[in-house]
């Protein structure tokens, strides 16, 4: 069954590939080729993107991909989602195929059996969210650069603090099968302040 992605250049049809954790281990050589190709393509655009999750963790801690990782993780500002989709045909020129597309959250491309996940982070209260991953604004405030495979890649501001936020204070210790944990900080925060906001509203209304 084919899926359809609507772009400014027309409809793009593709057959989705079933991707899931535990399917395989990353091939570092092929993944390196892919991430360098991706950098070359995106560096010619104004798309806001960068390394995140396990790819950023590996770049800082191992100076390489994590041996038990499975893919490449990239964040994209949700506002730039359509710009990424418009690059599908450009990705095709370099041998990438579309593997999956979840309209509001995730887009994946694959080349030589190694895939890249693009996470669309949408503006929320005090931060950005994709799926169940919430990241405070301070990490998106200014993009930073990190040297990876002798090239500079964009990433989150204050990357070491972000990794502590995402993985805990022991993020420097390698752990097999330890993935970025979804967090629901923003939900808890809203629930905690909501009663106060309601009380303030009623006070303002009645005085």
Model-identified regions with their sequence ranges:
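Catalytic cores of NTP-dependent nucleotidyl/adenyl transfer enzymes across multiple folds
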Residues: 7-17, 28, 32, 120-207
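Residues that flank catalytic or metal-binding motifs in active/ligand-binding sites
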Residues: 68-72, 103-105, 112-115, 142, ...
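Metal-dependent nucleotidyltransferase catalytic core
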Residues: 27-34, 76-103, 108-109
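Active-site nucleotide-donor binding segment shared across nucleotidyl transfer reactions
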Residues: 39-72
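Non-catalytic N-terminal targeting/anchoring module and adjacent flexible stem/linker
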Residues: 1-2, 86-90, 204-207
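Catalytic metal-binding acidic patch
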Residues: 63-83, 150
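Conserved catalytic core of nucleotide-sugar-dependent glycosyltransferases
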Residues: 104-129
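Helical scaffold of the NTase/Pol beta-like nucleotidyltransferase catalytic core
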Residues: 1-52
